[in-house]
Each structure stands twice: as C-alpha cells, then as structure tokens.
C-alpha cells in the first residue's frame, strides 16, 4: 500500500465468538461477506494503534460474521480487540461497474446545479433503503437523492464535479 493511499473503512470487531480466538465482525460491505475478499486489512484499535493483517479467514454464521486472524487463538486476545476498525486500501477494491460508484470516490467532489450554481462539496453519503443520498456541505448542508437522471445529471472525476438538477434554495 502506498503511504498516502486512501483507506476505506469496511467494518469493525464487535466481540468474541467462542473460546478459541474467533471474532465477531460488523461489515459494511455489500454483501457483508465481501469484507473477506479485500485484504490485507489495516486494523486500528480504539487507542489508535495500527497493524496490517493478511490471511484472515471468515464465514457467515446466522446473524454474525465470524473471522479468524492468524496468530489469535484465545478469547482474551479477542476481547482486547473489541472496537477495532477494519480498513483496506482503496486499490484493494475492484473497479466499479459502468454507472456505479464507490461512495468514497464521490466524497470531496464539488457539486453544482445544471445552471452552474455552486452548492458545495460532497461530505458523505448514506442509504435510505430506496436510494442513496449525497450530503453536500457549502453555505449550508443539503441532502440530495443520488438518483440518475432525476436529480444527478453527471459525475465527472476529471473535473472533480457532480452536476445536479436541484433548486439551490431547497
């Protein structure tokens, strides 16, 4: 991984499973088991200590994801890892399909209306279940449905710009 490469937060350790060092994970990938495809992991403890972990194995077990870290063999070690965040380098993810985007790639893009009114910068995105919403921070915060072609007209990474059909007073 390059020194300044962007990291993507994929999940976190939420507890121990059994007594042999297995961990329960919360995954924000879709599907949730995809977290195991992207390695090595950069893990950051709640205290800020980071390390790189490769060779993590895992499985879907009911409502939990269970993982095995190389060298972790007891419950006490796992309990000390509770709250640890799991990251990967952006380059570990496959290229998105045409007309699909990774949220992280949209963050920090400029947003303006089809009339050229600058609305601000993408702060983050979230899902409502029916569609994604882009949160734009400028003179104020706006939440714009990330829906093509109704509201989002174009995404241009070279120009660092998203063009939307949106009333700037809304």
Curated annotation (Swiss-Prot):
Keyword Chaperone belongs to the record: yes
Disulfide bridge map: none
GO biological process: ribosomal small subunit biogenesis; rRNA processing
Record GO cellular component, one term: ribosome
Domain PRC barrel, chain residue ranges per copy: 98-170
Stretches of the chain forming a coiled coil according to its record: none
Cell location: Cytoplasm
Xref: Pfam families: PRC_RimM, RimM
Keywords linked to the UniProt accession: Chaperone, Cytoplasm, Ribosome biogenesis, rRNA processing
GO molecular function: ribosome binding
The keyword Chloroplast appears for this protein: no
Gene3D superfamilies found in the cross-reference section: PRC-barrel domain, RimM
Entry's free-text remark on domains: The PRC barrel domain binds ribosomal protein uS19.
Family statement: Belongs to the RimM family.
NCBIfam families: 16S_RimM (TIGR02273)
Function: An accessory protein needed during the final step in the assembly of 30S ribosomal subunit, possibly for assembly of the head region. Essential for efficient processing of 16S rRNA. May be needed both before and after RbfA during the maturation of 16S rRNA. It has affinity for free ribosomal 30S subunits but not for 70S ribosomes.
Subunit structure: Binds ribosomal protein uS19.
Protein's recorded name: Ribosome maturation factor RimM
């Amino acid at each position: 991984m390059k020194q300044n490469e962007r990291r993507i937060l994929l999940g976190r350790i939420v507890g121990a499973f059994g007594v042999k060092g297995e961990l329960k994970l919360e995954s924000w990938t879709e599907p949730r088991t995809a977290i195991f495809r992207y390695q090595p992991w950069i893990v950051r403890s709640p205290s800020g200590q980071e390390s790189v972990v490769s060779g993590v194995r895992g499985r879907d077990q009911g409502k939990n994801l269970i993982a095995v870290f190389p060298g972790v063999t007891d419950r006490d070690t796992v309990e000390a890892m509770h709250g640890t965040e799991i990251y990967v380098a952006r380059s570990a993810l496959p290229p998105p399909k045409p007309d699909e985007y990774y949220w992280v790639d949209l963050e920090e893009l400029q947003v303006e209306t089809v009339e050229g009114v600058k609305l601000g910068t993408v702060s983050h995105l979230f899902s409502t279940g029916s569609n994604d919403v882009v949160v734009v921070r400028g003179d104020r915060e706006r939440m714009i449905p990330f829906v093509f072609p109704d509201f989002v007209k174009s995404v241009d990474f070279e120009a660092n710009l998203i063009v939307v059909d949106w009333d700037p007073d809304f």
